[in-house]
A protein has these predicted regions:
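Small-residue-rich helix-loop
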Residues: 245, 257-275
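An accessory alpha-helical subdomain
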Residues: 154, 158-248, 257-260
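Regular, well-ordered alpha-helical segments
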Residues: 60-63, 200
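Residues at or immediately flanking beta-strands
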Residues: 33, 72, 234, 251-253
Length: 275
């Protein structure tokens, strides 16, 4: 085990990680505070005691929808009737102290109720909205979280990751990219927004041609940049695998197979986005 010990020592030298985690009305926890050191940690307990809920809470310190991809409203602890009457805060929250390169940061995220007008039904509706704060300052872009902490997870539901559809694999790869490219989360979010917009334009049946072309051009530019970032991550992994041979498992070489990915073999991303 000396090789493993050496690698763990190298990781902990950087002194980066979660040193305090506080949950409020999160899943099965009314309140929870965990103090931790910068070291590998194993969480144990009975089935259903909330081990995965702690991991999910940590995953919300990174960009995205967490390791379960749950709806915001589903995360809040179900209150008993006697608490529901007295409860004035309808949301959940996760707060953490982060130590990164020997500097401390405060990260908080949670939900609050907001209201918007439904013009079709002529009424005001409330909805859950996620807010994020870094060092007590509210931020508008979740991608900012990537500057302070990155996380990768493999859950039992991902056991057939390489046997199922391509979308889960792309999502998993994108989360790996986030650790090296802070702008990648913003690019993927913008692409998904444009895709929904593009779909609605086509669905309407009376699309403005210039508007459609503009959206498609933006999607092409973002798509090429996303593919290029994924290729760079794959290249990093292949380099690591080549320099860290394993005596137990066979060697592997990773590749991305797709039209844009093949075009990037011979063309820069800027030109591919304009193709």
């Amino acid at each position: 085990m000396p090789e493993l010990t050496a690698k763990l020592n190298e990781i902990t030298k950087e002194k980066s990680g979660v040193t305090r985690l506080t949950l409020s009305d999160f899943r099965n926890y009314r309140s929870l505070r965990i103090e931790a050191e910068i070291a590998p940690i194993v969480i144990t307990g009975e089935n259903g005691s909330g081990k995965t809920n702690i991991l999910e809470a940590i995953s919300f310190l990174t960009p995205g929808r967490g390791l379960r991809s749950a709806k915001l409203a589903d995360i809040k602890r179900i209150l008993p009737p006697e608490e529901e009457i007295l409860n004035t805060n309808s949301g959940w929250s996760v707060a953490a102290e982060i130590l990164k390169n020997n500097e401390e940061y405060l990260i908080g995220t949670g939900t609050q109720k907001s209201f918007r007008e439904d013009t079709e039904e002529d009424e005001i509706k409330n909805f859950e909205r996620r807010i994020v704060k870094i060092n007590q300052q509210k931020i508008t872009q979740q991608s900012e979280l990537g500057k302070y902490i990155s996380a990768i997870w493999v859950t039992p539901q991902m056991d057939r990751l390489f046997l199922g559809g391509t979308q889960p694999r792309r999502s998993f790869l994108d989360r790996l990219v986030y650790a090296f490219d802070l702008e990648h989360a913003k690019r993927t979010a913008n692409f998904e927004h444009l895709y929904r917009q593009w779909f609605q334009i086509l669905k309407s049946g009376h699309a403005d041609e210039h508007w459609l072309q503009s959206v498609e051009a933006d999607m092409a530019t973002l798509g090429a940049a996303i593919a290029a970032a994924r290729r760079e991550l794959i290249a990093r992994l292949n380099t690591f695998i080549a320099h860290e041979p394993d005596d137990i498992f066979p060697d592997v070489r990773l590749e991305l197979d797709g039209t844009i990915e093949k075009m990037l073999d011979t063309m820069p991303a800027v030109k591919v986005g304009q193709f």
